[in-house]
Amino acid sequence: MARDKIALIGSGQIGGTLAHMIGLKELGDVVLFDIAEGVPQGKALDIAESSPVDGFDANFTGANSYEAIEGASVVIVTAGVPRKPGMSRDDLLSINLKVMEQVGAGIKKYAPDAFVICITNPLDAMVWALQKASGMPAKKVVGMAGVLDSARFRYFLADEFNVSVEDVTAFVLGGHGDTMVPLVKYSTVAGIPLPDLVKMGWTSQARLDEIVDRTRNGGAEIVNLLKTGSAFYAPAASAIAMAESYLRDKKRVLPVAAYLNGEYGVKDMYVGVPVVIGAKGVERIVEIEMAGKDREAFDKSVGAVQGLVDACKKIAPDLLGR
């Protein structure tokens, strides 16, 4: 049985980390694509040379032409300009929108049946643009956002309670930015909801609010620490979880930026919500109940995403005709 082919568009920090993780998990053969000559080839060779030590079998190829991604089962897009200190995700919009148009055309021509995961920021607008540019079914194009944001929330909670991260579940919905919505009500430790843990004296509401704020600013915190780039280990791990659920038909319930067409009262936009990912792509959108402040925060987040999408429409009106 032939191995799946996984194409990585962009061979920077996230792209290289993705390639290595795919090898370690033996998810398939890897094609690293980048416009910079030598970079994808060098990283592919370096990772391939680690395979005898790490004990995995996979082929790694570096390329500067989209032809190399032909027939890929999964395409993960990291191409674009990374966020720098003091730069908001919104600042990246016009630059990375052009990148998504080029990438979308390449995927449409060479890997039209792939499951596509977008990581490029500003995420919710970029995955929307990528889907429009590629013309692919919306259920086969998703954005990596909620898995990462939820992982950060889970880690902070596990650290606060001094428990295993495996016993912490958490959901972060909405846009992948400052307006994201960490849902305390639906987050648990070994099945015990966070509000109950406050009542039990494990933490205070004020401390919980601080953790929620830290989650919202998780990406910026790392950008400010690194000073020369942005996070790549956790984003790569998050995208791998999504790709694995698709390739192995695991049907995991994961929060991702998914195309909404009426769900949650949202139309023609990508927003972070829980979905089931299986062999058909997004197989189900899970609509959970939100009320009060949670619903207000979600609606505010949707409004922020709408603003980015509207900006995309002004910059590239031709996307709407695709």
Swiss-Prot record:
UniProt-listed Gene3D superfamilies: Lactate dehydrogenase/glycoside hydrolase, family 4, C-terminal, NAD(P)-binding Rossmann-like Domain
Residues holding NAD(+): G10, S11, G12, Q13, I14, G15, D34, N96, I119, T120, N121
Binding site for substrate: R83, R89, N121, R152
UniProt keyword Magnesium present: no
GO molecular function, one term: L-lactate dehydrogenase activity
Keywords: NAD, Oxidoreductase, Tricarboxylic acid cycle
Catalytic center residues: H176 (proton acceptor)
Enzyme Commission code(s) on record: 1.1.1.37
Entry-linked SUPFAM superfamilies: LDH C-terminal domain-like, NAD(P)-binding Rossmann-fold domains
Function description: Catalyzes the reversible oxidation of malate to oxaloacetate.
Family per similarity comment: Belongs to the LDH/MDH superfamily. MDH type 3 family.
UniProt name for this protein: Malate dehydrogenase
Species: Rhodopseudomonas palustris (strain HaA2)
Name of the encoding gene: mdh
